[in-house]
Amino acid sequence: MTITPRHRRTMYLSAALVAISVATPLTPASAAPLGTTAGTTYYVDATNGADSRAGTTPATAWRTLDKVGAATLRAGDTVAFKRGQSWTGTLKLSRSGTATAAITVGAYGTGASPVVRGGGSCVAITGAYWTVRDLRLTGCDWAGVEIEGHHNTVTGIRADANVVGVSIADTGHHNTVTRSQLVDNNKMSVNDPGGDNDSGAFGVLLNGDDNVVSHNTITGSYAASYDYGQDGAAVEIYDGDRNRIEYNITHDNETFSELGHDTGKTADGNVFAYNVVTSTHEYATFLVVRGPGSGLGPNRDTVAVNNSVNLPGAKAQGWVCHDGCASNILKLRNNVISVGGQTGYEDGAGADENTGVYKGAQHRFTLGARSVIADPRFTGGTDLHPLAGSPAIGRGEPAGYSVDLDGKPVPATGATAGAYQYQP
């Protein structure tokens, strides 16, 4: 596995934009299927189990992660770890389920979620059609979950105290990370004086294509960095195309998302929709994308719609589109952004921005015809529901989504900008 440096920091840039004409369809992507065909359930008990047993009842449970990794699991099977117990090492999932019958890893019994700690990655998925749920993955040297396969679903986990909560490698595609708690993943994998190579502190790292990150809570992706002072991101995309980051609540991360790619690769067509982004960090930033003038760009056809952002730090930023920004680099619609510093930055021809609400000390971009600079009237610092009289009400245009972050219907006309529809 290659750990890619982030090559930051983008503070208050002056660079050039690329003209964006984004026609990306904004319909929510489908999740990887969950298993529908019944198979065998195997139990794992760290205290009373034995790998020599059948594993098919709690009384005959297996004991170790290695036993699970070596088992000939089939489509529709389930591996259940006993609640209140912990394992050290890597759970290796190399077999594959099918589109109609995933292999499931979960929990049984009562008490706290089963814990896996230590190891390079606490869970490593190289197979396809797995569902991993209800585990806590903590203190891993790299990732809570690393996915190299396809059509896998990670749901209902807690990943904390790792370099990255969930990492999807360059071979990983059509995976879903959903309804999980990715908390205080605040370790750096590279952190040394000089240069421009520090890396780490990610909630989710996407090096693959066509993945969905949705309905998660991502907090505390933040760490000290020799190169940048501080670093970290809720969702980092590097060499990943057509990923969808939607319906997430994020708090106190250094950056919500930053995009880049290696020479000869791409990070195109990524969509950010209906996310709530709050942070008290001084340099917190919502979104960073690059044009062709950057060695990490261009990040073509990036789309940000209906995000609500509140970053009160004096040097906090909304969106940054630099080194040749243009309408085919970044399209923004229906975003509500309040920051202590600059709300948006563009150079070059400029981003395709409209129907937004902005509040901040600086606005270094051309405001769209239906955008406005005004107080968004959020309910609170982290509760970004709009209050009565908010300029976001009725400002939004259709963006292809039928419900908001609360699951409330989005009307075909007169929608509220931001992640939440106004509810009188």
Regions found by a protein language model. Name each.
Residues K92, R117-V123, G139-E146, A161-A169, ...:
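Extracellular beta-strand/beta-solenoid scaffold signature
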Residues S390-P424:
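Surface beta-loop-beta hairpin patches that serve as ligand-binding interfaces in beta-rich domains
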Residues T41, G76-T78, G84, T90, ...:
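Detector for repetitive beta-architecture
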Residues T78-G89, L93-A143, R179, A369-P376:
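Right-handed parallel beta-helix/beta-spiral solenoid domain characteristic of secreted/periplasmic
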Residues T2-P33:
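Secretory targeting and sorting signals
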Residues L135, N152, I157, N175, ...:
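Consensus "Asn ladder" position of solenoid repeat domains
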Residues S94, R244-T250, G269-D383:
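Predominantly extracellular beta-rich ligand-binding scaffolds that present long acidic/polar faces
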Residues A46-K82, S86-W87, D406, V410-P411, ...:
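Acidic Gly/Asp/Thr-rich repetitive segments characteristic of extracellular carbohydrate-active
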